[in-house]
Each structure stands twice: as structure tokens, then as C-alpha cells.
A protein has these predicted regions:
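Catalytic cores and adjacent flexible loops of soluble metabolic enzymes
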Residues: 1-317
Length: 317
């Protein structure tokens, strides 16, 4: 638990930038490695410390992650916490050979989605979490294992999802050896009431252990859902710069909840982030220039902070 609470302190919120992984998985214009490094560095300088930096997947099929080793090395040099998606033992072995600090596994909330998109049952997915944790324990016990529950608020195949199943799977992943679990609104079905209720249940399950919520803004509910999550025990939120991203299971999905908007919302609710909005704006400019034609989002980017007021992120340098 000590290692976990050092990375994700329970007494404050943590925002994870997932744009370099989730934000690029469906991107048409892929940024060059140099641009990704500049993006990472500028956002890190703005106070962002946690980055989901890529996926350990075959470079021939996923060229956007071919430079993951280089990105991990840069993150390590900058003392940023890096996480990478590990979908099988081969990915875990690759991750263990790097300086990645967190390995992310995925378990689907529904059997139909698990079989259709991961080619394994939910039980097998939980067992994989256990095997990844065992590999970690043997080779690099300082690394964290993160188990994310996909389709936690609704499934593109099965429809409604029983919250009891989500909580059960989260508990099973913790029992299997995961250090931290997360719940994902993968296809953007959730509303604030459902988010608040499930976060409250997960908070009870996890106790002193933090959990992650991963939100998409498919139907414009992302920022309201993030606020509901904070009000009900969530202290780690995934977001992406400019709302980059999409979901292969949700045609027309507009991506993740916007990182800049989440920072502004959290500060307005009294949750210090230590993140500088001006620095985020500069990082966004780097990403936009590197990805011509890609759609970026954000209410704060469009309107700016409120006029005639002094807005400053609490704790920002």
C-alpha cells in the first residue's frame, strides 16, 4: 500500500493524462516522436505528473506506439509516472524490460464484450491480472499493476450493466494482485447519478486504497460525470489534452473528457491540482501542430477562464 499511496496520495486528487495512449489509438494524424516528447515535457512542466504513455502492442499494427520505449525513457528522465497498456503476457514481459512504472490490464464488465473484443472470458481476464501481478512481483516489485473495468456503465453489445458485477470484478482484480482498480465509461453511456452511485460503492470496496475513473465525453456528460465522481470518493481521474481520443466500440465518440476542463472544474470545487492552465495551453498547441486535421475540444480553451477574476491553480509553481 505504501508504494501505491506514494504514487496516488489519498489526501488529494490525481489527474492522469491519457492522451498519449487513448488519445492516439484512433488518431488519423499521428504525431512524430519528437512532437510527443515535446508535448510530454511541456505538460509535465505544467504540473502534470501521471501519463498513460502508450500500449505494448505490435508496432506493425499500432505504429502510434512504436516509440513507446523512447517515450518511457523520456518520462523516466523527467521523473514522470508512466503507465502502459499490457493486454497479455507478452505485453507484460515487454513492459517489465522498461522503466515503465505502471502496467494497465483491462477486464470487461460484460461477457459478450470480453469475448468479442478481448477473445477471452472475464474469468480469464481476471486470471491474466493475477499472472501479470506475479510476473511483476518476480521481476520488478516496484511497478504497479492497474486493472481497469471496461464498459462499467453500459456495454455497446449487452446494453445495461449491473453495478454489482462491476464491484465484484473490481474486488476479484484486487484479490488477484492488482494494486489499483479503475472503472471506465468506455462508450459514454454514463450520467452523473450512475457515476456517483458506482463511485460510492467502489470507495467502500477500496477503503483507504484509491481507485481510478476513466470518462468519455461522447454525449457531453464528461465534466458533469467527473464532478459526480469527485463528490463520491474518486481521487484519480483520467482525461486527455483537448479531449483527444475515441472508442472503437462507439462510432462517433468524441473522445475522453477534456483535461483542461477537468483541471478548472476540480479547482472550482476546492480540489487543488497544482497544474498550470497556461502550460496546458502551450502543450495543446504542440499537440495541435503535430496532428493537423485532428479534432480537439474544450470549453475552457474556447471561452478562457472567467474575466475580471484572478484564477490560479492552487499549489501551481
Amino acid at each position: 500500500m505504501t508504494r501505491l499511496t506514494e504514487v496516488y496520495p489519498a489526501d488529494r486528487i490525481t489527474l492522469r493524462e491519457v492522451g498519449l495512449r487513448d488519445g492516439l489509438q484512433l488518431a488519423r494524424a499521428l504525431p512524430a516522436t519528437a512532437a510527443k516528447i515535446a508535448w510530454l515535457g511541456r505538460e509535465g512542466a505544467a504540473g502534470v505528473r501521471h501519463f498513460e504513455i502508450g500500449s505494448f502492442l505490435p508496432a506493425a499494427r499500432f505504429p502510434q506506439f512504436a516509440d513507446i520505449d523512447a517515450m518511457i525513457a523520456v518520462a523516466a528522465r523527467l521523473d514522470l509516472h508512466s503507465a502502459g497498456l499490457t493486454l497479455n503476457e507478452r505485453g507484460a514481459d515487454a513492459a517489465l524490460a522498461t522503466e515503465i512504472r505502471e502496467m494497465v490490464c483491462v477486464v470487461s464488465a460484460t461477457e459478450a464484450h470480453s469475448e468479442a473484443n478481448m477473445r477471452r472470458s472475464r474469468a480469464d481476464a481476471v486470471a491474466l491480472v493475477g499472472r501479470v501481478a506475479a510476473l511483476r512481483d518476480a521481476a520488478a516489485p516496484e511497478k504497479l499493476v492497474n486493472a481497469g473495468i471496461a464498459m462499467a456503465f453500459g456495454c455497446s453489445i449487452s446494453g445495461e450493466v449491473d453495478p454489482e458485477e462491476v464491484v465484484r470484478l473490481a474486488g476479484a482484480c484486487l484479490d488477484a494482485g492488482a494494486d489499483i482498480v479503475g472503472i471506465a465509461d468506455t462508450v459514454g453511456y454514463a450520467g452523473p447519478k450512475a457515476v456517483g452511485a458506482l463511485c460510492a460503492r467502489l470507495d467502500r470496496l477500496c477503503g483507504d486504497r484509491p481507485f481510478i475513473i476513466h470518462l468519455h465525453d461522447t454525449r457531453g456528460m464528461g465534466i458533469a460525470n467527473a464532478a459526480a465522481a469527485l463528490d463520491n470518493g474518486a481521487r484519480v481521474i483520467d482525461a486527455s489534452l483537448g479531449g483527444l481520443g475515441g472508442c472503437p466500440f462507439a462510432p462517433g465518440a468524441t473522445g475522453n473528457v477534456v483535461f483542461e476542463d477537468v483541471v478548472f472544474m476540480a479547482e472550482s470545487m476546492g480540489f487543488p491540482t497544482g497544474i498550470d492552465l497556461g502550460g496546458l495551453k502551450e502543450a495543446r498547441s504542440i499537440a495541435e501542430e503535430a496532428m493537423p486535421g485532428e479534432e480537439f475540444h474544450g470549453a475552457l480553451h474556447r471561452a478562457g477562464p472567467p474575466e475580471n477574476t484572478k484564477w490560479e491553480a492552487v499549489g501551481a509553481d
